[in-house]
Structure formats: structure tokens, C-alpha cells
Amino acid sequence: MAPKKAAKGDEAPKEVVSLGPTVREGEHVFGVAHIFASFNDTFVHVTDLSGRETISRVTGGMKVKADRDESSPYAAMLAAQDVAQKCKELGITALHIKLRATGGNRTKTPGPGAQSALRALARAGMKIGRIEDVTPIPTDSTRRKGGRRGRRL
């Protein structure tokens, strides 16, 4: 049997529920965008200021079908737009950026998606606070791959 429908006059008033923190007008709510740009993929991961609570995480590989396009600037832009939209829904209006390359004993240069992900966040209306490079730099590392004579082309 189908559930009974309520009469027109019996509806309770709907409450407005705010998901984000309560702030004054014109005040920015900050989050932290961790952008990890390697040459194989780009991660755009937004957390709260402590870094414990994930708000949204989207990768370039989630946005494009071809494996070769995962690290492309276009995929990074789409990922950043998705993240910015989710942040706005939750009331986050500004982001501190932590940019990271692969690092360690591998390349310390961010991949092709880093620049476009940052630009897409700014163009989506998010205010940018501090930009910091958090690529891991070894003080003395394990031996790098490639052998004694290096990679021969």
C-alpha cells in the first residue's frame, strides 16, 4: 500500500541548514588546497586548515578517459573547477595553496597541471591566500634509479 499524502495545511516550516562555519558578512573562510602535480597525474585535494578533514579530492584521471591526458592542463583545470564548486557549497571562500611535485630522489619540477589548476581555482572565484611549495627535498637520499652511467637515450 502506498504511503498517505499529507494534507495541504499540515506541512511543517522547512529549516534552513548551513553546512559551513558561521561567519560575518565579508569575512573569508579558508581551506587548504594541496595540489600534487606529477608527470602522470594531478591531484587537487582541499582540506580544512588543520589538514585532517578532507573537503574534496579530485584528480585529473577522474575527469578524462585517456590515460595519457591525466596530467594534462585541461584535466587539472576540470578537477580544480569541481573542487571549487564543492568548496563554495560548503561555505569555503578562500584557499591557501600547497603545491607539491614528486620530489625525493625524483624530479623536483611540478607537472604540467600545476599552473592550470591554480589558475582555475582563482578564476572560479576562490580567493588565494598563501602559495607554498611543499615538494619533499632530500637532505641525503637513497640512490637514484638509472645505474652508474645514468639513463642512456
UniProtKB/Swiss-Prot annotation:
One of its GO terms (biological process) is translation. GO terms for molecular function: structural constituent of ribosome. The keyword Ribosomal protein applies. One of its GO terms (cellular component) is ribosome. This is Small ribosomal subunit protein uS11. Keywords: Ribonucleoprotein, Ribosomal protein. It comes from Chlamydomonas reinhardtii. Gene3D superfamilies: Ribosomal protein S11 (3.30.420.80). Belongs to the universal ribosomal protein uS11 family. The keyword Nucleotide-binding does not apply. Signal peptide: none annotated. Pfam families: Ribosomal_S11.
